């Protein structure tokens, strides 16, 4: 998935962390909407906010810069880059939040129906992937035994 950050005319010191709908799309869970959400370091946020002072947002302490199609946050529910970037997947010019941390963010917002649906999609993917690995490691005799047991 290619995301062109050049419109920002900004050099990040750490790769921005892709979250939200585009991260859902990256994992093949659903298509994203028009906006592209990132979390960045406090250092990068301070510099980006200085560059776009008229594009700042504050959602209950979560500070963001909303410019072009990007919503770029210092934190989400006060969880910062260092917390959310653990086990992120490196891409060209940015990172993608781990599936487990994406699940965590969706759980925090699950009172909103859209995010509850996302939560279900992520849980289903995690379980499907885990059981696929388990199944592939079984011998054909073990697979046959399970198939007979469940028919």
Each language-model region and where it sits:
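Compositionally biased terminal segments of proteins
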Residues: 1-151
């Amino acid at each position: 998935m290619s995301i062109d950050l050049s419109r920002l005319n900004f050099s990040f010191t750490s790769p921005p962390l892709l979250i939200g709908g585009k991260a859902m799309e990256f994992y093949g869970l659903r298509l994203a909407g028009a906006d592209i959400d990132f979390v960045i370091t406090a250092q990068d946020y301070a510099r980006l906010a200085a560059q776009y002072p008229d594009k700042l947002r504050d959602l209950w302490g979560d500070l963001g810069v909303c410019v072009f199609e990007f919503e770029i946050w210092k934190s989400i529910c006060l969880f910062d880059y260092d917390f959310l970037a653990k086990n992120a997947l490196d891409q060209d010019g940015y990172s993608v939040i781990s599936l487990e941390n994406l699940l965590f963010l969706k759980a925090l917002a699950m009172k909103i129906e859209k995010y509850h649906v996302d939560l279900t999609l992520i849980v289903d993917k995690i379980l499907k992937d885990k059981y696929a690995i388990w199944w592939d490691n079984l011998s054909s005799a073990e697979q046959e035994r399970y198939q007979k047991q469940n028919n």
